[in-house]
Amino acid sequence: MSIRPATHAGSWYSNRAQELSQQLHTYLIKSTLKGPIHNARIIICPHAGYRYCGPTMAYSYASLDLNRNVKRIFILGPSHHIYFKNQILVSAFSELETPLGNLKVDTDLCKTLIQKEYPENGKKLFKPMDHDTDMAEHSLEMQLPMLVETLKWREISLDTVKVFPMMVSHNSVDVDRCIGNILSEYIKDPNNLFIVSSDFCHWGRRFQYTGYVGSKEELNDAIQEETEVEMLTARSKLSHHQVPIWQSIEIMDRYAMKTLSDTPNGERYDAWKQYLEITGNTICGEKPISVILSALSKIRDAGPSGIKFQWPNYSQSSHVTSIDDSSVSYASGYVTIG
């Protein structure tokens, strides 16, 4: 048995079990969603240090429709340290350590998926992740303690649920569609849940992104006319701009959420890609989100209520007012199916 150590415990979050459990439990019970939300089978949530994003993150987990029939939870996260293309990397560990208890990896599913090939060239679509890459990445690990705390909160034994971590980097549209086809079969099974790990806008020169819009209408016009948004520079006169930078960031982030909420299911993937191209918004989990959108587009019979995105909470690490400032945005979302 190979156990992935909790490499970010003691830095990104507490390595003391009682302290960590109390912190996360407090976030969960303070979220206005007492949940679970019926048929909320996919959540989108941030992956920063818990003191920054924990309160927002908790809204996603409080909504998750956990029940005693759940057998597997997929966790999709972006890669922050390595670049790869047209493949999904899956954890090669059999167990994942957290200070609150360990989670078992669905190793049987790993063996099944690494046999899947891209029909165009026979290349494997799923590949085991090397241990160093796995241990360096925080986007997947930051979901684990919150998941364990939520399972305990819902009185579900850790022994009854397996997880399946997946790292996503750069895929072509065709590969996204191919992977979406595979994952859609698992989404159709209500005993599978999905966690998509993503922060929203990373704003500031240190992130090489200073996009600005003065209003929702201005952004809507840019999308319709396919013109890129303004990028602020040190020479930009902020007094000539309609709203403070932090409000502009929120306008762009909420437009991203609205794109996912309001676009018909079969058109979401393309609308999402267009939004990203026009705004350049630095949503670090844009690629895992794209994979999920591709998978959802394959689901033709989603029940009487269809597929719906909801966004119960949003926050920013700080309010940017100057070109010299920076911030990261956090959004909690859930997707109901049926």
Curated annotation (Swiss-Prot):
Subcellular location: Cytoplasm; Nucleus
Transmembrane region(s): none
Major location category of this protein: cytoplasm
UniProt GO cellular component terms: cytoplasm; nucleus
Keywords in alphabetical order: Cytoplasm, Nucleus
One Pfam family hit: Memo
Keyword ATP-binding: no
Source organism, top-level taxon: Eukaryota
Disruption phenotype: Is synthetic lethal with PLC1.
Upregulation: Expression is induced by mild heat-stress on a non-fermentable carbon source. Expression is also induced upon entry into stationary phase and upon nitrogen deprivation. Expression is repressed by inosine and choline in an OPI1-dependent manner.
Cross-referenced HAMAP family: MEMO1
Family, per entry: Belongs to the MEMO1 family.
Entries under NCBIfam families matching the protein: AmmeMemoSam_B
The protein's role, per its UniProt record: Plays a role in haploid invasive growth under conditions of nutrient insufficiency, suggesting that the function of the MEMO1 family in cell motility/invasion is conserved across species.
More info: Present with 339 molecules/cell in log phase SD medium.
Name of the protein in question: MEMO1 family protein MHO1
